């Protein structure tokens, strides 16, 4: 059962709440969140579409077979540009399983257009063999079809 306490301006969920979006203004407290993830027995290669309306975390469990480009979008029919407003940011992660020959994320796109991320330390030039590469991206919308991306690569062996 959900209730709204007018005096405290609080929306209290005692069991569950289902909705398309929750817009909260001001400071919020969360005990915990569960992010939607997609786990796929797919090998990273070519251009990988990361659908932000589908997941916050994408995990490819088959060994990467080539360097890849990640393309961030809303989904196959909705642009990321259309679901974000200027001043918003989106944080996502892409996990890639590496075999004995490692590969890496060599390019980033948003809605099919190339962007130049600001990488922590430096852009990756390799992966790590027999590991899981974790790529984190924070995407800032700075204007119409204008984005700044900061990114990092970590390897878990």
Language-model features: where?
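Short carbohydrate-recognition loop motifs
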Residues: 55-60
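Intrinsic low-complexity, repeat-rich intrinsically disordered segments enriched
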Residues: 1-54
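Acidic, glycine/polar-enriched metal-coordinating patches/loops
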Residues: 63-157
């Amino acid at each position: 059962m959900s209730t709204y306490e007018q005096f405290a301006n609080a929306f209290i969920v005692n069991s569950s709440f289902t909705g398309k979006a929750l817009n909260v203004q001001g400071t919020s407290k969360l005990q915990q969140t569960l992010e939607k993830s997609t786990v796929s027995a797919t090998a990273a290669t070519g251009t990988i579409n990361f659908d932000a309306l589908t997941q916050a975390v994408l995990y490819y469990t088959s060994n990467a077979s080539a360097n890849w480009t990640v393309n961030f979008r809303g989904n196959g029919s909705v642009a990321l540009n259309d679901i974000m407003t200027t001043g918003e940011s989106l944080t996502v992660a892409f996990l890639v399983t590496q075999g004995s020959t490692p590969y890496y994320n060599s390019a980033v796109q948003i809605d099919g257009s190339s962007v130049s991320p600001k990488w922590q330390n430096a852009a990756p030039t390799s992966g790590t063999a027999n590991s899981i590469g974790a790529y984190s991206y924070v995407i800032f919308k700075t204007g119409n079809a204008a984005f700044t991306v900061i990114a990092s690569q970590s390897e878990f062996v």
